[in-house]
Amino acid sequence: MAGGAMTDTDGAHKNYPGKMTIFVFLACLVASSGGLIFGYDIGISGGVTSMDSFLIKFFPSVYAKEKEMVETNQYCKFDSELLTLFTSSLYLAALIASLFASVITRKFGRRITMLGGGVIFLVGAILNGAAADVAMLIIGRILLGIGVGFSNQAVPLYLSEMAPARMRGMLNISFQLMITVGILAANLINYFTDKIAGGWGWRVSLGLAAVPAVIMAGGSLFLPDTPNSLLSRGKENEARAMLRRIRGTDDVGPEYDDLVAASEASKAIENPWRTLLERRYRPQLVMSVLIPTLQQLTGINVVMFYAPVLFKTIGFGGTASLMSAVITGLVNMFATFVSIATVDRLGRRKLLLQGGVQMIFAQFILGTLIAVKFGTAGVANISRGYAIVVVLCICVFVSAFAWSWGPLGWLVPSEIFPLEIRSAAQSVVVVFNMAFTFIIAQIFLMMLCHLKFGLFYFFGAMELIMTGFVFFFLPETKGIPIEEMDRIWGKHWYWRRFVGAGAGGKVEITSTV
């Protein structure tokens, strides 16, 4: 298989010389700041849409409907296509932008893509903070989406290529950790800006998105590019020097040879999109489609960017709903550290399976709690004790996602693709992630209105399906060098029919023409 490496017939993977260096740690820390812009937007959008001053200015019909329905159906009071378009337009823009980002990443490197994403996101943040009408608001959201699309396409690849194999999981998950930090920061900012007299706090919330954008863009100016990217652009001497620097040793011959072989195979590919559709890459194609799709079908982004609206819907006051969102943001961030500490020791499959089971139970219990209190009529006065139980249940769900499908939904796809299809395949990951984020964001409030408490059962059923998918179809990838990843498919009971059983034994490096 193109981009493969020599592996022993017993399937033991190579252990390249090298160590974790301060240089790699700092580079990955700076690159992972790309997650801040994504996380900040997830957290900020739901908060401002629960602020009365924001609704009065841009969505007066939603505000009027909210006030009219205090004693009626709580499920439907925020159902507005225009309001959901404000939230979801970003993800549609990110979807389209990621396709263009693939070309930029391949031709100019991961660093340039991250820099461009940060600058475009910065412009969008300024427009949103200064918005005078809905059109200006949506245009700003679209620019934010382009920035997110560029960032999400390049950052996971950068982290996976810079990290040594035995620590790839931990370093790659720093991207998801930064997403959770962004969400928490946004929730805290919303809580305090909602208290600003004069009704302009939402401008501060939206405008402060410029801060993570500046961090990402500024940091990208000082980042080195990865050896993989340098080789694919014909910079052999720079690539070898960079590999020595990031591994902290001069003994990089075996790893460098494998990278060169992968690069030669990559250069032989004229159209990586067409190559991705070839039968031998069927496992990677399926994973690049289903993992991001299933990640969004957990319902996590519904909880995170609609958390204040959701809490308000089930009876919390405005300030209480924002504080509840802060609590879930804290849980989200701290639970991510569990994944960082265990992913390279326990492996990807165990975390995904255990997290899936926990999410299933949490969703069904949450649906039952809301069903008992609100029924199908959506009318109830929720007590403080009952509200606490609901928040605890949501926290159980969020924590499960944060140490499983949250970080691993980005990690696993970024580490399984050979170099010749890596940029294109990562764009597919981002496209499907953003597509289903857009779809769910656009229809969530309508689904809540029509399915009522059944919406949580729907997401629970999706989590049952995805847990089964991991159990049967996802092989373990921990500790395997990124350019040797092809061998796991040849040893898998199902995928070996596409790549050939020989891929699990000794694999000769070949190029595709």
Swiss-Prot record:
Keywords: Membrane, Sugar transport, Symport, Transmembrane, Transmembrane helix, Transport. CDD domains: MFS_STP. One of its GO terms (molecular function) is monosaccharide transmembrane transporter activity. The keyword Membrane applies. Induction: Repressed by cold. Repressed by abscisic acid (ABA). The chain crosses the membrane at residues 18-38, 82-102, 117-137, 140-160, 167-187, 202-222, 295-315, 321-341, 348-368, 386-406, 426-446, 451-471. Disulfide bonds: none annotated. The keyword Ligase does not apply. Residues 1-17, 103-116, 161-166, 223-294, 342-347, 407-425, 472-512 are cytoplasmic. It is a multi-pass membrane protein. Residues 39-81, 138-139, 188-201, 316-320, 369-385, 447-450 are extracellular. Gene3D superfamilies: MFS general substrate transporter like domains. InterPro entries: MFS_dom, MFS_STP/MST-like_plant, MFS_sugar_transport-like, MFS_trans_sf, STP/PLT_plant, Sugar/inositol_transpt, Sugar_transporter_CS. One of its GO terms (cellular component) is membrane. Expressed specifically in anthers. Belongs to the major facilitator superfamily. Sugar transporter (TC 2.A.1.1) family. Mediates active uptake of hexoses by sugar:proton symport. May play an important role in transporting monosaccharides during anther development. This is Sugar transport protein MST8. It comes from Oryza sativa subsp. japonica (Rice). The gene is MST8.
